[in-house]
Amino acid sequence: MVDQPDSENLDHAVDALSKRYDPLGTECRWQKIWEEEGAFHPDPNDEGEPFSVVIPPPNVTGSLHMGHAFNTALIDTIVRFQRLQGKNVLCLPGTDHASIAVQTILEKQLKKEGLTRDELGRSAFLERAWAWKSESGGRIVEQLRRLGYSVDWKRERFTMDTRLSKAVSEAFVRLHQQGLIYRGEYLVNWCPASSSAVSDLEVETKEVDGYLWHFQYPLSKINDSNGIRFLEVATTRPETMLGDVAVAVNPSDSRYSNIVGQTLTLPFLGREIPVIADDHVDMDFGTGCVKVTPAHDPNDFAIGQRHNLRQITVMNKDGTMNAEAGPFEGLDRFEARKAVVKALEQKGLLTKVEPYRHSVPFSDRGKVPIEPLLSTQWFVRMEPMAERCRSHLGKDEPRFYPDRWAKVYRDWLTGIRDWCISRQLWWGHRIPAWFVVSETNNELTDDTPYIVALSEKDALLEAQKKYGTDAVLRQDEDVLDTWFSSGLWPFSTLGWPDKTNADLSRWYPTNTLVTGFDIIFFWVARMTMMAGAFTGKMPFADVYIHGLVRDEQNRKMSKSAGNGIDPLLLIDRYGTDALRFALVKEVAGAGQDIRIDYDRAKDTSATVEAARNFANKLWNATRFALINLGDTTFKETFDELEHNRLELSDQWILSKLSKVNNETAKRYKKYALGEAAKGLYEFAWNDFCDWYLELIKRRLNLGESPSEADLSNRKKSQIVMFKVLRELLVMMHPLMPHLTEELWHGVTGFSNKKLLALQSWPALDKDLIDEDLELSFSELFGAIRLVRNLRAEAGLKPSQRAPVRFVTKNQNLLNLLKKATQDIQALTRANKVEILHPREIFEESSGRSLAGVSGELEVLLPIEGLVDLQALRNRLQKDLSKAENELSILSKRLDNPSFVQKAPEKVIEECRLKLSDAEAQAELVRQRLLGLK
């Protein structure tokens, strides 16, 4: 049963809905009401199937950008729809502590004060970090609130909350107990700017124009070497030659077979290094000789492991050269590069320098070249965890939308390297490991034993058991990679590891993850691996992957490109709902990038403005409905109406309503959100506003003495209009929540305390769908559009009435047109409407007419006596000459063999399309002229 409007408050509702839609005031009001009413604060004991989403936590350092706005619009559309489906929905928000980003900001502040973090001390530094987080970290949250996120702010989480920090320690300890976390020496990506290791995924590879330096190493002894006195190597990083421990050649390379096993003398240091044979070497590249620096190159590290070579680190962690660099000690790595090249040249060992474009890894945060550095770090063994995820993926867990991303995810899980999780920072989750030292010796070595425990108290008890009561503990200085805690996000936020937590029991696993393709491994894979290890389940059923927000030139938005758009500027100008709707409607398909235009000089966007205009359209349509419901007391409901006794236009809009209900629900469920938005837009703007409301105006606006039949028809149209508008607002709510909530309370009466956000999705009545009727009305609307075009061509003024004739062989269409004669007359400003079969058209002349065809309908607009026929003929003759001239030019171009052979296919195709359009236009004008004879 359809709710009835509160008739006593309808007049007030019209007054309450101002003539102009004020998005900012409306949004502010409803966001406050939703929060005060606890609309999005579910109880785990509430009825309804559970549905949960944890939002990707933005960094506390961040400000709202278009990526956030896009992600928010998609997530909120999904969760609001599920709420309307009667689900017990939890959408949980939170923020990430962003170790490197926050620490970088704070260290820049300290630098301005003439301090370093070491001078300030760890405790004071962390006090500053928490103070900064309290003052600035809430900015992104307040900005997210402006987007109308229907999240449970009472359950807001922060990755360094006490509960979440305990979960991080628990996860670390468990993985260590399972042998999946270990401490070892390995080459890591070192960022000298932040003095920290960074993961492979925090490295951005850039193409750089540099040089390839060729130089020689002399053989230590000239024995049986086929006259070879030197071996030539080449590198883009000559400063690393100071750490060389060998030169490798391919074992199949006959040029060097006699000198494998001999030694070379390393310039400047005098160190003797062996010539070794290794299959890794490409004998066809350069001279076929490769310098081996295990402590500064991943490939060389592997060679060193195979040949048991020494590992010599020649750089400090700040990027300067250490004592192993001999005469170059103390130089910055790039200064050392210049100095080494110059010294090689002076010794006559530099043979060639050539320009060389190559890939250089940069720190994503520090923005400086990464230095592969040998370091003792904490690692997670990834392969056992990845294998569990691959097994789940075989069972379609999780499902990816679109499904092509499942392969990308699987590829990431295949051949995976161990994950370096320690970071040389202070802001973050400190590693729960304590080194066992003594009161007299607090220094750490590679052999210093350590204890991994949940707390220092637990660690001390274990240390005393193992090493005696005089054991002294020193906690590891490092913190965990931010992605470690983010990997626990879907279940740590719900109370894990407390298995008795009601939220965890009710809402885990979660239902949907919405995220960008760029962090499938950064975050998605790590969440699935962590969840598999700790819960035995995948953390979400579905993963909806969206694309990027690009500008009108299809460029990725970024600070460096200077083409980013501040969403708050667009929100201030057009409103949150307009921005949200524009973003979702632009999605052509799941995973596709979207484009948003922006005029920087005017702070305007045509795309978002169009969405704002749509909001205005809905606002005005609702005001129209309220004005025409204001004197109504509904004594009957829609369910009591006899469908077959409704006007055909009522039956048509109800068919369209049922169809859009069915299609929209399916699209929302399948994450076809862009298609859902487009379908609702077409229904609301075209079907409901432009056609149905225009069709029923005649029935709503009764004369002074209406008949009982007129009053009955008016009541029916009011009931149908109310039903359609009410259900449209419910279906539109996930996309434009503030606007629809305001209009809902206008339609149902402002005394209605029930929030639209908590209503039920409209029941679907497929029996109302009538495909034949919809097809007939489509023909009718096409004919009406044609009449309007013919009137415009004839130059008729809006006030001028003219007869119109419709001719068709289709009997069903004839019947519809005859029943809709009064509506046609009103919509075409006709003083007379004739509906004829072709055999009837010859019974009397229609005089000089403009004619056209729309589908199965021929339309005649008799205009003799209404316009200057000669002037109209002259204008049409000019149009014909123009079209024929265009035809001639295009035909000659396409008949030219040279053009067809040399022009790009795209240009030729455009020319053919223009020719087709010109032919159609010429034929149309000829028909118009024929009707005027």
Curated annotation (Swiss-Prot):
Q: Which SUPFAM superfamilies match?
A: Anticodon-binding domain of a subclass of class I aminoacyl-tRNA synthetases (SSF47323), Nucleotidylyl transferase (SSF52374), tRNA-binding arm (SSF46589), ValRS/IleRS/LeuRS editing domain (SSF50677)
User: Motif 'HIGH' region, which positions?
Assistant: 58-68
Reactions the enzyme catalyzes: tRNA(Val) + L-valine + ATP = L-valyl-tRNA(Val) + AMP + diphosphate
**Where does motif 'KMSKS' region map?**
556-560
Any matching Pfam family: Anticodon_1
Q: Which PROSITE patterns match?
A: AA_TRNA_LIGASE_I (PS00178)
Which keywords does this Swiss-Prot/TrEMBL entry list?
Aminoacyl-tRNA synthetase, ATP-binding, Coiled coil, Cytoplasm, Ligase, Nucleotide-binding, Protein biosynthesis
Q: Which cysteines are joined by disulfide bonds?
A: none
Signal peptide coordinates: none
Q: Coiled coil where? A: 807-833, 864-933
Provide the GO MF annotations for this entry.
aminoacyl-tRNA deacylase activity; ATP binding; valine-tRNA ligase activity
Q: What is its EC number?
A: 6.1.1.9
Residues annotated as binding ATP are 559
GO CC, sorted alphabetically, is: cytosol
GO biological process entries: valyl-tRNA aminoacylation
Superkingdom field: Bacteria
> Where can this protein be found?
Cytoplasm
- Quaternary organization: Monomer.
Family as reported in the entry's similarity comment = Belongs to the class-I aminoacyl-tRNA synthetase family. ValS type 1 subfamily.
Q: Its biological function?
A: Catalyzes the attachment of valine to tRNA(Val). As ValRS can inadvertently accommodate and process structurally similar amino acids such as threonine, to avoid such errors, it has a 'posttransfer' editing activity that hydrolyzes mischarged Thr-tRNA(Val) in a tRNA-dependent manner.
Q: What is known of its domains?
A: ValRS has two distinct active sites: one for aminoacylation and one for editing. The misactivated threonine is translocated from the active site to the editing site. The C-terminal coiled-coil domain is crucial for aminoacylation activity.
Provide the protein name. Valine--tRNA ligase
Q: Can you name the source organism?
A: Prochlorococcus marinus (strain SARG / CCMP1375 / SS120)
Gene (UniProt): valS
